[in-house]
Protein backbone atom coordinates (compact mmCIF):
# COMPACT_ATOMS: atom_id res chain seq x y z
CA UNK A 1 0.00 0.00 0.00
CA UNK A 2 1.44 3.38 -0.97
CA UNK A 3 1.54 6.30 1.45
CA UNK A 4 -0.05 9.02 -0.64
CA UNK A 5 0.40 10.38 -4.13
CA UNK A 6 2.22 13.55 -3.08
CA UNK A 7 4.70 12.05 -0.63
CA UNK A 8 5.56 9.10 -2.86
CA UNK A 9 5.95 11.29 -5.95
CA UNK A 10 7.89 14.15 -4.38
CA UNK A 11 10.52 11.77 -2.99
CA UNK A 12 10.96 10.27 -6.44
CA UNK A 13 11.35 13.79 -7.84
CA UNK A 14 14.01 14.69 -5.27
CA UNK A 15 15.90 11.49 -6.00
CA UNK A 16 15.72 12.17 -9.75
CA UNK A 17 17.14 15.67 -9.32
CA UNK A 18 19.85 14.77 -6.84
CA UNK A 19 21.14 12.04 -9.13
CA UNK A 20 21.86 14.82 -11.68
CA UNK A 21 23.96 16.80 -9.21
CA UNK A 22 25.74 13.79 -7.76
CA UNK A 23 26.57 12.50 -11.24
CA UNK A 24 27.88 15.89 -12.35
CA UNK A 25 30.23 16.03 -9.38
CA UNK A 26 31.55 12.53 -9.97
CA UNK A 27 32.03 13.02 -13.70
CA UNK A 28 33.78 16.36 -13.36
CA UNK A 29 35.96 14.94 -10.60
CA UNK A 30 36.94 11.96 -12.71
CA UNK A 31 37.77 14.23 -15.63
CA UNK A 32 40.01 16.35 -13.43
CA UNK A 33 37.80 19.41 -13.63
CA UNK A 34 37.07 19.52 -9.89
CA UNK A 35 39.07 18.83 -6.75
CA UNK A 36 36.76 16.82 -4.50
CA UNK A 37 39.33 15.92 -1.84
CA UNK A 38 37.89 18.24 0.80
CA UNK A 39 34.22 17.58 0.09
CA UNK A 40 33.88 13.78 -0.15
CA UNK A 41 34.28 11.33 2.74
CA UNK A 42 37.65 9.55 2.37
CA UNK A 43 36.06 6.12 1.95
CA UNK A 44 33.83 7.45 -0.85
CA UNK A 45 36.66 9.39 -2.46
CA UNK A 46 38.70 6.19 -2.65
CA UNK A 47 36.06 4.59 -4.86
CA UNK A 48 34.57 7.48 -6.82
CA UNK A 49 37.01 7.32 -9.73
CA UNK A 50 35.65 3.92 -10.72
CA UNK A 51 32.78 3.68 -13.18
CA UNK A 52 30.82 2.08 -10.41
CA UNK A 53 30.54 3.47 -6.89
CA UNK A 54 29.63 0.68 -4.47
CA UNK A 55 29.08 1.98 -0.94
CA UNK A 56 26.98 -0.85 0.46
CA UNK A 57 29.57 -1.60 3.15
CA UNK A 58 29.43 1.91 4.62
CA UNK A 59 27.21 2.93 7.52
CA UNK A 60 27.45 -0.42 9.29
CA UNK A 61 26.40 -2.20 6.14
CA UNK A 62 23.50 0.11 5.27
CA UNK A 63 25.28 2.21 2.65
CA UNK A 64 25.89 5.94 2.33
CA UNK A 65 23.13 7.73 4.23
CA UNK A 66 20.96 10.14 2.29
CA UNK A 67 21.90 12.87 4.73
CA UNK A 68 25.55 12.15 3.94
CA UNK A 69 24.77 12.50 0.24
CA UNK A 70 23.08 15.83 0.96
CA UNK A 71 26.11 16.97 2.93
CA UNK A 72 28.36 16.09 0.00
CA UNK A 73 26.19 18.15 -2.34
CA UNK A 74 26.08 21.06 0.13
CA UNK A 75 29.86 20.92 0.65
CA UNK A 76 30.26 21.17 -3.12
CA UNK A 77 28.14 24.31 -3.45
CA UNK A 78 30.92 26.29 -5.12
CA UNK A 79 31.70 23.42 -7.47
CA UNK A 80 28.04 22.96 -8.37
CA UNK A 81 27.67 26.63 -9.20
CA UNK A 82 30.12 26.01 -12.04
CA UNK A 83 28.44 22.91 -13.48
CA UNK A 84 24.79 22.88 -12.36
CA UNK A 85 22.55 25.31 -14.32
CA UNK A 86 19.79 24.92 -11.71
CA UNK A 87 22.01 25.33 -8.67
CA UNK A 88 19.64 27.73 -6.89
CA UNK A 89 16.82 25.22 -7.25
CA UNK A 90 19.03 22.40 -5.95
CA UNK A 91 19.97 24.50 -2.91
CA UNK A 92 16.32 25.29 -2.13
CA UNK A 93 15.35 21.66 -2.64
CA UNK A 94 17.99 20.49 -0.17
CA UNK A 95 16.71 22.96 2.44
CA UNK A 96 13.22 21.61 1.88
CA UNK A 97 14.34 17.99 2.17
CA UNK A 98 16.21 18.70 5.38
CA UNK A 99 13.18 20.46 6.84
CA UNK A 100 10.86 17.60 5.90
CA UNK A 101 13.12 14.83 7.11
CA UNK A 102 14.14 16.73 10.26
CA UNK A 103 16.70 14.06 11.07
CA UNK A 104 20.43 13.65 11.52
CA UNK A 105 22.55 10.76 10.24
CA UNK A 106 21.81 8.59 13.26
CA UNK A 107 18.13 8.46 12.36
CA UNK A 108 18.58 8.14 8.60
CA UNK A 109 16.27 5.70 6.87
CA UNK A 110 17.33 6.25 3.24
CA UNK A 111 20.68 5.10 1.88
CA UNK A 112 22.59 5.18 -1.40
CA UNK A 113 23.84 1.67 -2.16
CA UNK A 114 25.39 1.79 -5.63
CA UNK A 115 25.91 4.43 -8.28
CA UNK A 116 26.85 3.45 -11.81
CA UNK A 117 27.86 5.50 -14.84
CA UNK A 118 28.86 2.65 -17.08
CA UNK A 119 29.62 4.32 -20.37
CA UNK A 120 30.54 7.99 -20.75
CA UNK A 121 29.52 7.88 -24.41
CA UNK A 122 25.93 6.93 -23.66
CA UNK A 123 25.56 8.59 -20.26
CA UNK A 124 23.51 5.74 -18.77
CA UNK A 125 23.65 6.66 -15.10
CA UNK A 126 21.61 5.10 -12.33
CA UNK A 127 21.66 4.90 -8.57
CA UNK A 128 20.14 2.38 -6.18
CA UNK A 129 18.55 3.69 -2.98
CA UNK A 130 17.40 1.68 0.03
CA UNK A 131 14.49 2.94 2.17
CA UNK A 132 14.61 1.03 5.46
CA UNK A 133 11.40 2.59 6.81
CA UNK A 134 9.13 1.70 3.89
CA UNK A 135 11.14 -1.39 2.82
CA UNK A 136 11.69 -0.13 -0.72
CA UNK A 137 14.67 -0.40 -3.04
CA UNK A 138 14.54 2.28 -5.74
CA UNK A 139 16.39 2.39 -9.05
CA UNK A 140 16.88 6.04 -10.06
CA UNK A 141 17.85 6.83 -13.66
CA UNK A 142 19.45 10.13 -14.51
CA UNK A 143 17.90 11.89 -17.47
CA UNK A 144 19.29 13.88 -20.39
CA UNK A 145 22.05 16.19 -19.26
CA UNK A 146 21.61 18.93 -21.88
CA UNK A 147 20.21 19.50 -25.35
CA UNK A 148 23.38 18.73 -27.31
CA UNK A 149 24.54 15.31 -26.09
CA UNK A 150 23.92 11.88 -27.51
CA UNK A 151 21.18 11.61 -24.87
CA UNK A 152 19.04 14.01 -26.88
CA UNK A 153 19.95 12.45 -30.18
CA UNK A 154 18.54 9.28 -28.66
CA UNK A 155 15.43 11.06 -27.35
CA UNK A 156 14.62 12.48 -30.77
CA UNK A 157 15.32 9.39 -32.85
CA UNK A 158 12.28 7.37 -33.86
CA UNK A 159 13.59 3.93 -34.78
CA UNK A 160 11.82 0.93 -33.27
CA UNK A 161 13.16 -2.27 -31.73
CA UNK A 162 11.39 -5.54 -31.04
CA UNK A 163 11.32 -6.39 -27.33
CA UNK A 164 10.40 -9.94 -26.36
CA UNK A 165 6.91 -10.24 -24.94
CA UNK A 166 6.94 -11.56 -21.35
CA UNK A 167 5.95 -15.23 -21.29
CA UNK A 168 3.22 -14.66 -18.74
CA UNK A 169 1.41 -12.31 -21.18
CA UNK A 170 1.35 -14.53 -24.24
CA UNK A 171 -2.00 -16.18 -23.47
CA UNK A 172 -3.62 -12.76 -23.18
CA UNK A 173 -2.26 -11.32 -26.43
CA UNK A 174 -2.82 -12.05 -30.10
CA UNK A 175 -0.79 -12.25 -33.29
CA UNK A 176 2.66 -10.69 -33.38
CA UNK A 177 2.24 -9.39 -29.83
CA UNK A 178 2.69 -12.93 -28.56
CA UNK A 179 6.30 -12.68 -29.74
CA UNK A 180 7.32 -9.06 -29.34
CA UNK A 181 6.28 -5.48 -28.71
CA UNK A 182 7.82 -2.50 -30.46
CA UNK A 183 9.72 0.05 -28.37
CA UNK A 184 12.08 2.97 -28.94
CA UNK A 185 15.39 1.47 -30.11
CA UNK A 186 17.64 4.02 -28.44
CA UNK A 187 15.99 3.63 -25.03
CA UNK A 188 16.01 -0.15 -25.37
CA UNK A 189 19.71 -0.28 -26.19
CA UNK A 190 20.63 1.74 -23.11
CA UNK A 191 19.55 -1.15 -20.87
CA UNK A 192 19.10 -4.34 -22.85
CA UNK A 193 21.51 -4.33 -25.80
CA UNK A 194 24.80 -3.09 -24.45
CA UNK A 195 27.14 -5.97 -23.68
CA UNK A 196 30.43 -4.75 -22.28
CA UNK A 197 33.78 -6.50 -22.55
CA UNK A 198 32.78 -8.88 -19.75
CA UNK A 199 29.46 -9.64 -21.41
CA UNK A 200 27.32 -7.95 -18.75
CA UNK A 201 24.07 -6.24 -19.67
CA UNK A 202 23.09 -3.17 -17.69
CA UNK A 203 19.82 -4.94 -16.96
CA UNK A 204 21.73 -7.83 -15.38
CA UNK A 205 23.82 -5.38 -13.36
CA UNK A 206 20.67 -3.72 -12.05
CA UNK A 207 19.22 -7.10 -11.08
CA UNK A 208 22.40 -7.91 -9.18
CA UNK A 209 22.19 -4.55 -7.40
CA UNK A 210 18.61 -4.94 -6.19
CA UNK A 211 18.37 -8.68 -5.53
CA UNK A 212 20.03 -8.65 -2.06
CA UNK A 213 17.46 -6.13 -0.84
CA UNK A 214 14.51 -7.92 -2.41
CA UNK A 215 15.61 -11.06 -0.60
CA UNK A 216 15.28 -9.05 2.63
CA UNK A 217 11.64 -8.24 1.80
CA UNK A 218 12.05 -4.93 -0.04
CA UNK A 219 9.61 -3.85 -2.78
CA UNK A 220 10.94 -2.47 -6.07
CA UNK A 221 10.43 1.15 -7.16
CA UNK A 222 11.79 2.79 -10.31
CA UNK A 223 11.99 6.48 -11.18
CA UNK A 224 13.62 8.98 -13.50
CA UNK A 225 13.20 12.28 -15.32
CA UNK A 226 13.17 12.83 -19.10
CA UNK A 227 15.43 10.19 -20.67
CA UNK A 228 15.61 8.65 -17.20
CA UNK A 229 11.82 8.38 -17.19
CA UNK A 230 11.87 6.45 -20.46
CA UNK A 231 14.47 4.05 -19.07
CA UNK A 232 12.44 3.67 -15.88
CA UNK A 233 9.36 2.76 -17.94
CA UNK A 234 11.19 0.01 -19.83
CA UNK A 235 12.87 -1.38 -16.72
CA UNK A 236 9.55 -1.45 -14.84
CA UNK A 237 7.89 -3.27 -17.76
CA UNK A 238 10.69 -5.84 -17.91
CA UNK A 239 10.64 -6.46 -14.16
CA UNK A 240 6.85 -6.64 -14.00
CA UNK A 241 6.78 -9.21 -16.80
CA UNK A 242 9.64 -11.29 -15.43
CA UNK A 243 9.03 -14.90 -14.44
CA UNK A 244 11.90 -14.81 -11.94
CA UNK A 245 10.36 -15.98 -8.69
CA UNK A 246 12.37 -13.60 -6.52
CA UNK A 247 11.02 -10.42 -8.15
CA UNK A 248 8.07 -9.12 -6.06
CA UNK A 249 4.97 -7.64 -7.71
CA UNK A 250 3.73 -5.09 -8.26
CA UNK A 251 6.63 -3.04 -9.54
CA UNK A 252 5.98 0.65 -8.86
CA UNK A 253 7.22 3.26 -11.33
CA UNK A 254 6.87 7.03 -10.87
CA UNK A 255 8.36 9.03 -13.72
CA UNK A 256 8.65 12.69 -14.71
CA UNK A 257 8.40 14.15 -18.23
CA UNK A 258 8.81 10.87 -20.04
CA UNK A 259 9.02 10.88 -23.84
CA UNK A 260 7.17 8.15 -25.72
CA UNK A 261 8.60 4.68 -25.16
CA UNK A 262 6.63 2.23 -27.34
CA UNK A 263 3.82 1.73 -29.83
CA UNK A 264 0.21 0.68 -29.25
CA UNK A 265 1.28 -2.97 -28.94
CA UNK A 266 3.59 -2.04 -26.08
CA UNK A 267 0.70 -0.17 -24.48
CA UNK A 268 -1.55 -3.23 -24.84
CA UNK A 269 1.00 -5.46 -23.13
CA UNK A 270 1.72 -2.84 -20.46
CA UNK A 271 -1.99 -2.42 -19.70
CA UNK A 272 -2.36 -6.19 -19.36
CA UNK A 273 0.39 -6.17 -16.73
CA UNK A 274 -1.51 -3.40 -14.94
CA UNK A 275 -4.71 -5.44 -15.04
CA UNK A 276 -2.84 -8.44 -13.63
CA UNK A 277 -1.60 -6.28 -10.74
CA UNK A 278 2.06 -6.69 -11.73
CA UNK A 279 2.82 -3.00 -12.27
CA UNK A 280 1.69 0.37 -10.94
CA UNK A 281 2.84 3.36 -12.98
CA UNK A 282 2.31 7.08 -12.37
CA UNK A 283 3.59 9.17 -15.28
CA UNK A 284 3.85 12.83 -14.21
CA UNK A 285 4.24 15.67 -16.70
CA UNK A 286 3.67 19.39 -17.00
CA UNK A 287 1.11 20.76 -19.39
CA UNK A 288 2.99 22.61 -22.17
CA UNK A 289 6.12 20.46 -21.83
CA UNK A 290 7.10 19.34 -25.32
CA UNK A 291 9.32 16.40 -24.35
CA UNK A 292 6.42 14.01 -23.53
CA UNK A 293 5.23 14.48 -27.13
CA UNK A 294 8.43 13.18 -28.79
CA UNK A 295 9.01 11.22 -30.88
CA UNK A 296 5.35 11.25 -32.06
CA UNK A 297 5.81 8.49 -34.61
CA UNK A 298 8.30 6.33 -36.47
CA UNK A 299 8.14 5.46 -40.14
CA UNK A 300 5.09 3.46 -41.15
CA UNK A 301 1.35 3.25 -40.58
CA UNK A 302 -0.79 3.71 -37.49
CA UNK A 303 0.78 0.78 -35.68
CA UNK A 304 4.02 2.74 -35.76
CA UNK A 305 2.57 5.60 -33.73
CA UNK A 306 4.06 5.98 -30.27
CA UNK A 307 1.71 5.68 -27.30
CA UNK A 308 2.02 6.58 -23.63
CA UNK A 309 1.34 4.10 -20.82
CA UNK A 310 0.31 4.21 -17.18
CA UNK A 311 -1.79 6.65 -15.19
CA UNK A 312 -0.94 10.20 -16.22
CA UNK A 313 -0.80 13.03 -13.68
CA UNK A 314 -0.87 16.13 -15.86
CA UNK A 315 0.04 19.26 -13.92
CA UNK A 316 -1.22 22.79 -14.55
CA UNK A 317 -0.50 25.98 -12.62
CA UNK A 318 -3.65 25.69 -10.51
CA UNK A 319 -5.03 22.20 -11.19
CA UNK A 320 -4.25 18.70 -12.41
CA UNK A 321 -5.83 15.92 -14.44
CA UNK A 322 -5.49 12.20 -13.77
CA UNK A 323 -6.18 9.95 -16.75
CA UNK A 324 -5.39 6.56 -18.20
CA UNK A 325 -4.41 6.48 -21.90
CA UNK A 326 -6.41 4.94 -24.76
CA UNK A 327 -5.62 3.97 -28.36
CA UNK A 328 -8.16 6.04 -30.29
CA UNK A 329 -5.61 8.07 -32.27
CA UNK A 330 -6.12 11.37 -30.40
CA UNK A 331 -2.73 11.04 -28.78
CA UNK A 332 -1.06 11.16 -32.17
CA UNK A 333 -2.89 14.28 -33.33
CA UNK A 334 -2.23 16.05 -30.06
CA UNK A 335 1.43 15.04 -30.02
CA UNK A 336 2.12 16.36 -33.50
CA UNK A 337 0.33 19.61 -32.77
CA UNK A 338 2.23 20.11 -29.53
CA UNK A 339 5.67 19.22 -30.85
CA UNK A 340 5.28 21.43 -33.92
CA UNK A 341 3.67 24.51 -32.43
CA UNK A 342 5.28 24.91 -29.03
CA UNK A 343 8.42 27.08 -28.88
CA UNK A 344 11.76 25.76 -27.66
CA UNK A 345 11.64 27.92 -24.53
CA UNK A 346 8.63 25.95 -23.33
CA UNK A 347 10.84 22.86 -23.17
CA UNK A 348 13.30 24.65 -20.92
CA UNK A 349 10.58 26.10 -18.69
CA UNK A 350 8.08 23.28 -18.37
CA UNK A 351 10.49 20.35 -18.62
CA UNK A 352 12.33 21.37 -15.47
CA UNK A 353 11.76 19.36 -12.30
CA UNK A 354 11.45 22.67 -10.47
CA UNK A 355 8.24 23.46 -12.35
CA UNK A 356 6.95 19.95 -11.63
CA UNK A 357 7.66 20.42 -7.93
CA UNK A 358 6.09 23.90 -7.79
CA UNK A 359 2.89 22.63 -9.40
CA UNK A 360 2.75 19.57 -7.16
CA UNK A 361 3.21 21.75 -4.10
CA UNK A 362 0.26 23.87 -5.23
CA UNK A 363 -1.88 20.69 -5.25
CA UNK A 364 -0.27 19.08 -2.20
CA UNK A 365 -3.41 18.82 -0.06
CA UNK A 366 -5.44 17.13 -2.79
CA UNK A 367 -2.65 14.77 -3.81
CA UNK A 368 -2.08 13.73 -0.19
CA UNK A 369 -5.64 12.39 -0.12
CA UNK A 370 -4.90 9.98 -2.99
CA UNK A 371 -2.69 6.96 -3.42
CA UNK A 372 -1.68 4.88 -6.40
CA UNK A 373 -3.40 1.69 -5.25
CA UNK A 374 -6.74 3.49 -4.94
CA UNK A 375 -6.34 5.04 -8.39
CA UNK A 376 -5.92 1.60 -9.92
CA UNK A 377 -8.99 0.40 -8.01
CA UNK A 378 -11.03 3.31 -9.42
CA UNK A 379 -13.04 1.89 -12.33
CA UNK A 380 -13.84 5.36 -13.64
CA UNK A 381 -10.14 6.06 -14.07
CA UNK A 382 -8.50 2.73 -14.85
CA UNK A 383 -11.48 0.64 -15.94
CA UNK A 384 -12.80 3.14 -18.49
CA UNK A 385 -9.80 4.57 -20.40
CA UNK A 386 -11.58 7.57 -21.90
CA UNK A 387 -12.57 9.09 -18.55
CA UNK A 388 -10.43 11.32 -16.38
CA UNK A 389 -10.43 12.84 -12.91
CA UNK A 390 -9.72 16.54 -12.50
CA UNK A 391 -8.40 18.47 -9.53
Where in this protein do the model-derived segments appear?
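Non-catalytic, mobile gating and regulatory segments of ester bond hydrolases
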Residues: 1-223, 227-391
Amino acid sequence: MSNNLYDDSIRMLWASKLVYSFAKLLQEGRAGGLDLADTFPPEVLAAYKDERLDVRDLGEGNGLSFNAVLKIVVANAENLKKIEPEFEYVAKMIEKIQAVENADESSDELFLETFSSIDAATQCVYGVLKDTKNKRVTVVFRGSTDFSTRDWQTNLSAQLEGMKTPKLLKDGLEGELKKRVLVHRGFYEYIFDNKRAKGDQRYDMILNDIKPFVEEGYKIYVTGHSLGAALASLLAFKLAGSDKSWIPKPITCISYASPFVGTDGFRTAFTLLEQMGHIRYLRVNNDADTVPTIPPFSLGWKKRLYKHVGINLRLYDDSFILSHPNSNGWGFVNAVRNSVLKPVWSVLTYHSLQTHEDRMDAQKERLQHMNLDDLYANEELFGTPKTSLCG
